[in-house]
Amino acid sequence: MNTYFNCHSHTMYSNIRLLDCINRPKDLIKTAKELGLCGIAITDHECLSSHMEVNKFAKSLQETDPNFTIALGNEIYLTDDRESNQKYYHFILIAKDGIGHKALRELSSIAWNNSYVDRRMERVPTLKSELKEIVNKYKGHLIATTACIGGELGTLILQLHECELVNDMTNASVYYQ
């Protein structure tokens, strides 16, 4: 078996607010196994709805392949505040255990309870201050990582790269703070 573990994948449950993915959880997991991965994390876009289905399927897999790991996570949208016309940075959280999953549920509930419409789309951001509070409350039970090019780190790297391409580093100091 391969030692590669996919820690960022989406299922059809990511479509709760936008059309993003057509993968059924079972099919995604089966494909990961067929590819020889050692595990996969389900990290839908601010949605934990697939987790019950995934857990049920994971239990059936344990009998045939106890070494294959399925992790439950969430791709949240990080912001400093809840104002319109801002960037909603993608950020991955993965539960290490049941306590970590409780933290995911708590953060998701806060985000959905404070959702609002911005640019004709329902937004469900997690404030950085809320993330910090929950991470401290459930210290050691979550894995956190940048998500994709839509994450804050990816965005900053791209912006810095653009400054380098046009040989104009006057704005680059913003990225080194």
State each model region's role.
Residues 1-177:
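Phosphodiester-processing cores and adjacent nucleic acid-binding clamps
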